[in-house]
């Protein structure tokens, strides 16, 4: 069906735009949707030749739909519809004339909506092509930032260990300083006698007390 549509494209371009129906445009929209999915899949799998071929086909379809949209006449306003309908009623054929205009307006609106969907699909395909390298770069940056956070957290743990070791050493030095302070106080209480003599006097006084 896709090849048939591509063969019909040059023939339909020479026809009057009223020959283009909404069903014909919908077929092109369905084909464009499948082409977009194929383009994304081929980009992810690294099939560059297939991706380029699908992109070229999508571009041709979108250019054809854009040409149809540009050649479509603008729908008449509501005032002109009612005015022409009133004139037709005066002439005796207002009912059928108004109905024909209503149907033509609805068909033009459906065609324009289909063409707007085609243009939005083209923008989506272009955004997918542009965002893919940026998404890969953002993923790499996120990976590097996570590695940096892990290394920094590891350094923080080692620094915390050094702090604990320093505090433990400080407590150890403070404990060793306590006997020195006690021995110094004992020396002052005994009138500056030597450390050995002070211990002997302390033992003798203990024996006398027993």
UniProtKB/Swiss-Prot annotation:
Gene knockout outcome: Small and narrow lateral organs, such as leaves, cotyledons, and flowers. Significant defects in the number of cells in both the leaf blade and leaf petiole. Excessive postmitotic cell enlargement in leaves (compensation phenotype). Plant missing GIF1/AN3 and OLI2, OLI5 or OLI7 have a strong compensation phenotype. The double mutant an3 han-30 exhibits severe defects in cotyledon development such as ectopic roots formation at the apical region of the embryo and seedlings, and associated with an abnormal expansion of PLT1 expression from the basal embryonic region to the apical region.
Any Pfam family matching the protein: SSXT
Tagged with keyword Transcription regulation: yes
Signal peptide: none
Chain intervals with Gly residues compositional bias: 182-198
Keyword terms of this UniProt record: Activator, Transcription, Transcription regulation
Amino acid composition bias (Low complexity), ranges on this chain: 135-152
Domain of life: Eukaryota
Region of interest (Disordered), residue spans: 135-210
Quaternary structure and interacting proteins, as annotated: Interacts with GRF1, GRF2, GRF5 and GRF9.
Stated role: Transcription coactivator that plays a role in the regulation of cell expansion in leaf and cotyledons tissues. Component of a network formed by miR396, the GRFs and their interacting factors (GIFs) acting in the regulation of meristem function, at least partially through the control of cell proliferation. Appears to function synergistically with GRF1 as a transcriptional coactivator. Acts together with GRF5 for the development of appropriate leaf size and shape through the promotion and/or maintenance of cell proliferation activity in leaf primordia.
Family per record: Belongs to the SS18 family.
Protein name: GRF1-interacting factor 1
Phylogenetic lineage: Eukaryota, Viridiplantae, Streptophyta, Embryophyta, Tracheophyta
Gene for this chain: GIF1
């Amino acid at each position: 069906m896709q090849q048939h549509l591509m063969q019909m494209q040059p023939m339909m371009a020479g026809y009057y735009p009223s020959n283009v129906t909404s069903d014909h445009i919908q077929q092109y929209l369905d084909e464009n949707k499948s082409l977009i999915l194929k383009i994304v899949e081929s980009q992810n799998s690294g099939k560059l030749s297939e991706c380029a071929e699908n992109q070229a086909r999508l571009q041709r379809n979108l250019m054809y739909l854009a040409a149809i949209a540009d050649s479509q006449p603008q729908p008449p306003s509501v005032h002109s519809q009612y005015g022409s309908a009133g004139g037709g009623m005066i002439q005796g054929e207002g009912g059928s004339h108004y109905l024909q205009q209503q149907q033509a307006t609805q068909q033009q609106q459906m065609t324009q909506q289909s063409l707007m969907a085609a243009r939005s699909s083209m923008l989506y395909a272009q955004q997918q092509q542009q965002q893919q390298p940026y998404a890969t770069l953002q993923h790499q940056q996120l990976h590097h930032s996570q590695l940096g956070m892990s290394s920094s957290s590891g350094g923080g743990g080692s620094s915390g260990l050094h702090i604990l070791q320093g505090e433990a050493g400080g407590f150890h030095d403070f404990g060793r300083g306590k006997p020195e302070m006690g021995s110094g106080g004992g020396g002052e209480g005994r009138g500056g006698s030597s450390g050995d003599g002070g211990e002997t006097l302390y033992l003798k006084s203990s024996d006398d007390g027993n």
